[in-house]
């Protein structure tokens, strides 16, 4: 079963929000007027619904996200916890976990990815065979999203090589391929390889720095 953020993760972040412990320091400078994020001020709080997976069931959990405002031009920014990705209700561990299952397997299909022990991850009312489940098209969209984190991945590689100049990461990334039956266009091929590269970079980054590229790095580069 791919990992998921837990209720405890979300509750812990909510407590940080309530205690004013969320700062803008890991946000990028304002792209409009170049003011550094350390000068940003709290603008608003926005409730966000997250979908987590508990014992094969998809359940909702709620948490407040903090929006900061640039004092130079009034542009606003959302500070995301490391279990969140912009515009996605499912948590980052679920998104990366299910996506990795597909791109790292030569034979896995999208339909097989959403199945665990011959059962599909579904919603609490799934006593009916017609009840909604995690859709295979959702996995496809997640892979597309993760393939777009090019700046984050590029910077992560630089940091990894600075820490360990003899790292095998560049060699490992260069020889990545995907089965031809998994794509029909060169664009999709690039997206699949890009997602697979992110999965490998994340593993290297976790092993080297004991933290995720999503904790600060992805936020710093505006999830690009």
Labelled PLM ranges:
Residues 64, 89-92:
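Intrinsic disorder
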